[in-house]
């Protein structure tokens, strides 16, 4: 079996080496692992890149070749005990109690043996009463540490070493009990299971909101208890090659979800849609629908907050691949008013509907088109809007001056054929200078 496994590993290593060599030949002369980065950055066609963070929040990372891992874990024993699984924790604590009883049982047996309590004719004043074998010494250690006190075995005043051993075992037993109880309570109060009632939508959507392309996903809290100081974060992970030729397998880029405006802090009583505006600072600024389908990245979303019952911080994670970003979709409403109350229907939590007329181009192209349209609109006017208003105001003032002159002439009167002075009828005219 060992030889077959070794052969399989060797063949796998050779195959991987051949594939890497073939990739380097296709890419041409480039930088290799000893300082040169591979030329291709995008994943091969037809190959799906594995998730860095799974949908349930677990990180798809495995640590290998760690030097001194056991010593590092033992140096932080309490955290190690809290992080391990329950079965290993119970096994560790059972072995700890058993080792403690065996250790002090051996100490009691040695004290009794050195005093001569195990001899055929027992001494008149033994160190321990009714302790004549190792099994009896083990039972005495168990009864002492657990405070069972059956009333048969006991320590006498004959041996000070025996009294000191009993005192030492009581202290060690208290310390061990405190450690075990603290670790168990910390593990039980760990807010890890709170994440089971915090959910993310299965897909994220890209649609227009307030005339801007936005990336949106939904979060919800299934419990009636609130998540205190809840806030969201997001990061985009993708491979990148720097201008210096350094290849970064997973480059972390922050995705703005309203940190500056405070919209990243949410009141998670009902499901909320998190919005990322795709602007010039967004890593998705140059991606349209077609480019998004061919992109190679992973969007990691994080929800953090304090559990209301324990005030302990919890973190819920999920991720979205490009295939899980639905372009031109919106989420169905989940909050409805029923009488004097609001009702949340989680049947619609993951559902989306298509929005006709959503542009398929990138946000950058939309901004360029809007800028071109504004330039063409401005070029159609010979002057600015201020100049246009000023010309109309000037024409209106001139018209008012003409009216005043006419009123003066009207006061003097104009003679008619019969010699009577008749008033002059004036028709004011507003001269507006309109742009061509």
From Swiss-Prot:
Where in this protein does the record put region Disordered? 14-43, 400-436
Query: Intramembrane ranges in this entry?
Result: 134-150
Q: Name one GO cellular component term.
A: voltage-gated potassium channel complex
Show the ranges annotated as biased composition (Acidic residues). 400-418
Span(s) of short sequence motif Selectivity filter: 147-152
The Gene Ontology terms for molecular function here are:
inward rectifier potassium channel activity
SUPFAM superfamilies per the record? E set domains, Voltage-gated potassium channels
What stretches pass through the bilayer?
84-110, 160-187
User: Which Cys residues form disulphide pairs?
Assistant: none
Q: What positions are modified (S-nitrosocysteine)?
A: 81
Q: Which residues lie on this side of the membrane: Extracellular?
A: 111-133, 151-159
Q: What keywords are assigned to this protein?
A: Ion channel, Ion transport, Membrane, Potassium, Potassium transport, S-nitrosylation, Transmembrane, Transmembrane helix, Transport, Voltage-gated channel
Q: In which tissues is it expressed?
A: Expressed preferentially in retina.
What the entry lists under InterPro entries is as follows: Ig_E-set (IPR014756), IRK_C (IPR041647), K_chnl_inward-rec_Kir (IPR016449), K_chnl_inward-rec_Kir_cyto (IPR013518), Kir_TM (IPR040445)
What superkingdom does the record give? Eukaryota
Q: What does this protein do?
A: Inward rectifier potassium channels are characterized by a greater tendency to allow potassium to flow into the cell rather than out of it. Their voltage dependence is regulated by the concentration of extracellular potassium; as external potassium is raised, the voltage range of the channel opening shifts to more positive voltages.
Per its record, how is this protein called by name?
ATP-sensitive inward rectifier potassium channel 14
Q: Tell me the organism.
A: Homo sapiens (Human)
**Organismal lineage:** Eukaryota, Metazoa, Chordata, Craniata, Vertebrata
Q: Which gene encodes it?
A: KCNJ14
